[in-house]
């Protein structure tokens, strides 16, 4: 049975209690700049990097060498232009020792409507992937997708080029051999995730879809691994981790979120044990 640990407090302090190299995957969506003022106080864009660096330093310490850190974040428009705090944060984290391995896009299929004089509404958010080393655990087959109807037509009549490796004309070293995919019904996904926002807790300000952490948990962990969300909010990441038989740690500064997550994650029919120690809860 997966174990869920709920820690109440500021993650800057709570992360210090976790052992070195003890976490396999970190998936989180911290407060964006000037956002969640009623729940987390809001962090000004100019102060965001300085605010997050102590947190990312602790995350670097507790992540296993083979582990992955997924950071959901987005820019904020200030005085008519996008602030650069996200780009500055990436550079600062690289200076800390992180490898910025990949950037994925969360396409929000049901984003909020709106109109601005110099831009369109945001329909995407960044999913930044950081690692401690170039070789890390990654199970790509776990997130493969159905090839769909396109394969029935595209792969029906193959050209000569399709039957040999199609080397890039620009000499990039990338190429493809379409013939290899004729008998396959699965394909590797792109780095764009098309997911609608959702939130079972309407009082929580971050609409984090369950499918998002699920995708990364399947991709980067196996049952029994440890998943961490240092800004757990309503506990979406923890719910998914438990369903997928991964141990999970959730941290939040608000007691209300801790209590709600505890009430949801504890199954009275199975008489799960609850341990309370100085405001810290362990659900096993």
State what each model feature region is.
Residues 1-260, 268, 276, 283-284:
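Core catalytic lobe of class I
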């Amino acid at each position: 049975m997966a174990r869920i640990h709920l820690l109440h407090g500021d993650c800057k302090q709570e992360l210090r209690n976790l052992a070195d190299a003890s976490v396999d995957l970190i998936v989180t969506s911290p407060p964006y700049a000037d956002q969640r003022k009623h729940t987390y106080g809001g962090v000004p864009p100019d102060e965001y990097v300085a605010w997050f660096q102590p947190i990312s330093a602790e995350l670097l310490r507790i992540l296993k060498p083979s582990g992955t850190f997924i950071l959901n974040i987005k820019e904020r428009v200030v005085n008519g232009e996008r602030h650069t705090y996200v780009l500055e944060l990436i550079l600062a984290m690289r200076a800390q020792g992180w490898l910025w391995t990949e950037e994925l896009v969360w396409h929000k299929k049901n984003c909020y409507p709106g109109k601005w004089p110099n831009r369109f509404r945001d329909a995407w958010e960044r999913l930044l992937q950081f690692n401690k080393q170039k070789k890390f655990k990654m199970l790509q087959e776990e997130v493969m997708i159905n090839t769909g109807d396109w394969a029935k037509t595209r792969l029906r009549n193959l050209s000569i080029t399709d039957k040999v490796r199609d080397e890039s004309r620009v000499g990039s070293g990338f190429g493809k051999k379409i013939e290899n995919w004729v008998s396959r019904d699965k394909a590797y996904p792109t780095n764009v995730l098309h997911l609608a926002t959702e939130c079972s807790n309407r009082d929580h300000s971050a609409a984090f879809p369950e499918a998002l952490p699920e995708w990364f948990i399947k991709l980067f962990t196996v049952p029994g691994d440890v998943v961490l969300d240092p800004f757990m909010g309503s506990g979406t990441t923890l719910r998914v981790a438990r369903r997928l038989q991964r141990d999970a740690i959730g941290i939040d500064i608000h007691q209300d979120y801790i209590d709600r997550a505890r009430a949801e994650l504890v199954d009275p029919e199975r008489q799960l044990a609850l341990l309370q120690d100085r405001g810290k809860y362990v659900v096993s």
